[in-house]
Amino acid sequence: MQRIHVVAAVVMALAVSTSAARAQGEHGRGRGRGHEGGPPPVTAEDQQRRIHEEQQRMTDYRRHLDDEVRNQQQREAELQAQRRQAQFRAQQEYAAQLARQQEQIRAERDYARESYITSPHIYRFRVGGVYRETNQYGADLLRQAINYGYREGYRAGEADRRDHWRFDYANSPAYLEATFGYSGSYLDQSDYSYYFREGFRRGYEDGYYNRLRYGSAANGGYSILANVLTGILQLTTIH
């Protein structure tokens, strides 16, 4: 009987040892797949750098919005003096949205708990010949910038057409401000504005000439075509 117990104990020990070895091997292979099959995790140092960048972006954008909201009355007065009533109404709506954004970004944020901080960079994009890297959150925001730019551009172009004003997207208040939909997160404001203006220019052209070359209309709104957006953004995957 004692001999049977000893044999059973040995068999059990071997089974446990084999199971542990198998689990350790799978765990090791899993780690290897994590690095080989995808980007490495964001280091603690890079996480701290991102937190600092996000804090600085928010500070800068709050200051920018404070200045812009103060300047809206002057811009509206200029449009009224030029008798551009359609553009004046469009500018009022744009100013109201900026005021809402100003309220939204006043809330405090716990940056360390935000998924953006630990999400690896997987995309590369270009601004003025300079390459940048970003993660899924930044890529989604770039797409939003282009689409919002197109929508606001269409409205501005349509307003200038109705006012019988010259083709002049570069002096449209929304084009100059160019942060509609930005929240001080994921991207530098200048990068967001760059792509917002790319969408705006095309939307303005469609609105001014009363056509849909670069976008489509649905439910009373306008959005840029997917292939046009892809051509503007030209995101590449980081290998």
Give residue ranges: language-model regions:
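C-terminal segment of classical bacterial N-terminal signal peptides
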Residues: 14-22
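Extracellular, intrinsically disordered low-complexity regions of secreted proteins
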Residues: 11-12, 61
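Bacterial N-terminal signal peptides that target proteins for export
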Residues: 1-8
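Glycine- and aromatic-enriched low-complexity segments, predominantly in secreted/extracellular proteins
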Residues: 21-239
